[in-house]
Design a protein with these regions (language model features):
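Acidic, low-complexity/disordered segments
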Residues: 1-13, 88, 92-96, 102-111, ...
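Short secondary-structure boundary/capping segments within folded domains
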Residues: 35-40, 258-260, 318
């Protein structure tokens, strides 16, 4: 069951359920494409088609609202609405979590050197996610925590948004960033420990690559020089966020790169996509999972890169890998957006059926 609460100053809260919706899409992810990468700063997305055939919701009702999402009694975060669209008795609405608030300028009068933690906390404050600069507003669970940005090359820092800085630091912490359930900025590494096991009998659909990605090298650049650690035996994990590396002195640069190399060398993952017969709402992006294919009698392992929940409470899970792996093995990636599909279908004749949450627990 969906419970969606809209709050706005000067207006009583509006609570919608699946009975009020023609469509529902939720998506959480930790990187944008199908290729495994560090430094993701993706916002969770909520997409709704609201039934307004009786014109019960006047213009402006859902504009600039704060949205609370609950599914089967579990809290799924707060969201900020974009301007809704109306047509044929339907209100189309997209909302994003507070990660989008980090799309604000970083202050140019900020002085360095500073620790990563201090810069994270400053970004949270600048974005309006906290009333003061405090380490308590940031949760670090990276390959290693913290780090130091020197006073050198800070013009690259000032030229970026807070979100870009968070992405760069999260990459060098060996993980990805997101807004957690208590609305704090959190940086997590990709887990090496399997926390969920499924068999193909638990799944409605299962597609996976014939090849497993095994990292054997980490590669990056700093000040027009390329640095590599590892061998050519497997795949290369590339750190791309150079404006953070510019701010690292040579000793720290090598130390941080070594820590990431030690963690991700021999890190294995198999690109896959599956739909659960029963949703698992305790599964999170970044979790390491294992799926046993009963027909092929093989176990495949990967890290969750995207979770999508649709209107009937079906839950599709994607574990990314590398684009060249997926294209060479016949793996069908799930980059096709269910949200875009819903938008196209909604632009038909305006006739649609209400949601049925038959798949929920």
């Amino acid at each position: 069951m969906f419970l969606i609460t809209f709050s706005k100053a000067g207006q009583e809260d509006i609570v919608l359920t699946e009975d009020d919706l023609f469509d529902f899409q939720y998506e959480a992810s930790c990187y944008s494409g199908e290729s495994f990468e560090l430094g993701g700063v993706n916002a969770k997305t909520l997409y709704l088609l609201i039934d307004n055939n009786t014109q019960r919701f006047s213009r402006g009702t859902f504009a600039n609202c704060r949205v609370k999402l609950e599914i089967d009694g579990k809290f799924f975060g707060y969201y900020n609405t974009e301007l809704p669209k109306r047509r044929n008795g339907v209100i189309e609405l997209t909302a994003y979590d507070d990660m989008v608030k980090l799309d604000t300028e970083f202050p140019t009068d900020y002085t360095f050197p500073q620790t990563f933690w201090a810069v994270y906390a400053q970004c949270v404050f600048e974005a309006g996610l906290a009333s003061e600069v405090s380490f308590d507003n940031v949760v670090l669970n990276g390959v290693w925590d913290n780090g130091i940005i020197s006073a050198d090359y800070t013009q690259y820092i000032y030229a970026n948004s807070c979100r870009n800085l968070v992405a760069g630091m999260a990459e060098w912490n060996g993980g990805f960033a997101y807004i957690n359930d208590v609305n704090k900025l959190q940086i997590d590494k990709f887990s090496k420990t399997v926390t969920r096991e499924y068999s193909s009998g638990d799944l409605m659909e299962l597609d996976y690559s014939d090849e497993t990605v095994v990292f054997s090298k980490v590669k990056t650049s700093q000040k027009n020089k390329t640095y590599e650690m590892g061998t050519d035996a497997g795949y290369t994990l590339v750190l791309k966020n150079q404006y953070i590396s510019y701010g690292l002195d040579d000793t720290m640069f090598e130390t941080y790169l070594t820590k990431i190399s030690e963690y991700y060398t021999v890190f294995e993952l198999t690109p896959m996509s599956f739909t659960l017969a029963e949703p698992d709402f305790d599964l999170h992006v970044g979790d390491r999972i294992q799926v046993y294919d009963e027909e092929e009698q093989v176990a495949i392992t990967g890290n969750v890169s995207k979770i999508a929940i649709s209107g009937n409470c079906s839950m599709t899970v994607t574990c990314g890998g590398f684009e060249n792996v997926s294209s060479s093995s016949g793996f069908t990636p799930t980059s096709y957006s269910q949200i875009q599909q819903s938008k196209q279908e909604a632009k038909g004749d305006g006739t649609a059926e209400k949601l049925q949450t038959t798949g929920s627990k």
